[in-house]
Each structure stands twice: as structure tokens, then as C-alpha cells.
Amino acid sequence: MQAMSTETFIGNMRGPVVRRMDADYDAVRSLYNGMIDKSPMMIARCTDVADVVASVNFARQNDLQVAIRGGGHNGPGLGSVDNGLMIDMSMMKGVRVNPTACTVRAGPGCTQGDVDHATHIYGLAVPAGIVSTTGIAGLTLGGGTGYLTRKHGLTTDNLLEADVVLADGRIVTANKSENADLYWGLRGGGGNFGIVTSFLFQAHPVNVVYAGPVFWDIEDARTIMQKYRDFLPGAPEELGAFVGLKTVPPMAPFPAEHQGKRACAVIACYNGPTGDGQAVMAKLLEKLPPPLFNWMGEMPYPALQSMFDPFFPKGLQWYWRGDFVNELPDEAIDAHIAQARNAPSALSLMHLYPIDGAVRRVGKSDTAWNTRNATWSMVIAGIDPNPQKAGEVTRWTKGYWEAVHPYSADGGYVNFMMDDGDDSRLKATYGDNYDRLVALKDKYDPTNFFRVNQNIRPLHS
């Protein structure tokens, strides 16, 4: 078969195809992580499934490497590729809510904010992350942790169905009864098996929540982390609360007298009656020293989801590392605090996201996501707007991770991997599910067409 020409491909596309000579090329190819700069040969800006199929067929016939962009929030820049084809689905943002069935169908270009906007008017939400600019596609396929995780599970646990374009250009549906093996692999296996063009989610009742951040001086961090560690297992699952080592942002609306201080924070969300949330948090706060400030209060759920957006715009320098954590002994807490004191910038941070509760009620082999017994998913992120500090934030992150990794469980969250997602790391992450994922890759993508990702290589690639 003769390979599709560029002219034919462009003619087959409803959306624009952006090339290097085009005026908007640099703007379109730019990535969320300003530390990463890639130069694709072409960018296919898909508007529908037919555009995605045309892009896959063109790339396959012309032996082009492809990268898949959904919401465009990928940390290691895996949504782009040098000298290949970026299949950009960021314009495919449709959201349809079925309030009777409590389900949501979302396009692959949607961000969490897009989904929250559509669901909130019905008093519903899909469990997702903590920043509204996060793309729902990569979040779901890699796992998805956030404020609702303890009560309702991972984002991927709430995926009911997906429409997928395979490497050969076929379109299939994956759910419990149709292509069930692919449905299994999509829930945690990343973008290894195809391009998801439609996600069907289970949504849950969420409207106004009792939520917000509480900050303490880092001198109190040991006590805060100890009491938080001891409190969490007995806390109701309606409480989603993560602990972080951060810096009070040097900007309004944060109190001027505390701006720039190294801090320990608990950012919490209680999805239930406000009085119940206040009572639950009081049981934790009464054990702790007085905070620098406590901004917990009633707010619409989307307001909580977007609270941190202004601090993390597109284009910052990012380097992150993560681990799963089962226990948090005092020695680990001390190691965390020692590293956090030397944070290279005001934006650099460490967060421990709880992944107990509902996550543990799913079997280890029920989805590709294998980690069902951990307590937290940890991320360490070196962040700064200045490109000259890229090396410094990277070194700090790696050093911090090396200091606390001995206290971690096996593997890490694939959405928190950068350049550390090699075969051994992925095998540790997927555990007993890894061989099954390789077999699935052999079936659905035997040539490793989809390889610009945290890659599970087929057996004979």
C-alpha cells in the first residue's frame, strides 16, 4: 500500500495541521513544563475521532513516531515528540452529563475544570486531582488521586467505558463486557494501548464542601506530620486531606508577615455536612500547635479544585519524583523536613496524597493499577519560573527523593514519573500485573507504535 501523502492527510483532517513554517507553530507546540522543548514535524489538531484515525493511519504508513496530547498537562513532556507527529486532542472538549445515571462522558481534551464545570450544576463530581488544569485523559489512564479518593477511589476506578483508536486505525469500545481485557489495561496502564477518544465516568454527589488549607511554621512540621499520620487511618472517608512541606507563597492573598516562610500544610476537603467536617477537623487541630493561618470554610467544589491554579501556570520549570508510601516513621519525617528546609524556590514542594479507603476495596488484579495497600502517593516537585534554575530544582528533587526513598514502598505513580520510568521501575510499580500488561501490549500494539509514554514494551519489540 502506498503511504498517505502529507497533502492527502491534511485534506482528510477537519482540524488544522500545524507545521514548522506556520506562524502559530511555537505557540501550539509549547508544553506545560517549560523545562522541556520538543519540535514535532507536524501537529495534528484533532477535532473529532475521524481526525484521530487519520492521524494514526498517516503516522503508521509513513513510519512517524507519534505522541499523544490530551489536556496538555504532562510533566515529562510525553505529549510531544521531536521530528514526529503530535496528535493533539486538546480541542476535543465535549462533556455530557447524565444526572439520572450519575455518569459523565468527556472528550480527551478536557481538563478537570471542564468536567467540574459541567457536573457541578447537577451536584456531581468525578474523582480527580487537585489542580483544575490537569488533563482528564492522562490523569485517568495513569490512576488519578485527589480529594475524593478515600471515599470514591481513583479516577481510573470510576472509568466505566472508553472508546479507543488502536494502532491499526480501528475504533473499539472497552468496558466490562466488550474488550474487557483492554478495559482492564486502560485503568492504570497509561497510554500504551491506544488513543482514548471518549471517557465514560461514574460521578458522585459533591456540591459545597468544607475545605481549604491550614499552614504551620516548618518548626512545627514534625508534630504536624506525626499527628496527621496517626489521625488519618481512623478519619472518615469523607475527609480527603493531604500533608505537604511547602513555602507560604510570597504574594497576596497570603498574610504579608508569613510570606516566604517554610511551612507544613494540611490541605483538606470534607465532602459532607459542614458541621460534621468542622467536628472531624477539630479532632485533628486540637492535637496541634496554633497554625500560621487556617483558611478552611465552605466553598463550591470547583473553587477548591481551582484554588492552586494561579500558582502553577503553564511554562514553569518542573522536575518531580514520586513513590508509594505504606508507613511514615519518625525517621522518615525527619528526613523529609531536613530536605524541605533546603527547597530551592518558593514553589518547590512535597505532598503526601492519601490512597487508602476506597482504593483498597479494589483488588490488586482487578485493574492495571496494582498498588492497593499503600497509604500515600508521594510527590516531590522542584518548581521555578526561571529557566536558569532548572538544574538546581532538578538536583534538589533527586537528592530529596534519594533521602526518603528507603522509607517507601515498591514502585511509584506513573503520572509522577519523569526520566525514571525504566523497565525496572515500571515492573516494581505494576508488580504481578506487569506480565499481563506486556501480553496486552502484544495483542493491541505489537509494534510499540504508542511508545512515547511510560512504556510497557511488547515482548518481541
Q: Where are the regions that the model predicts?
A:
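Soluble FAD-dependent oxygen oxidases
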Residues: 1-461
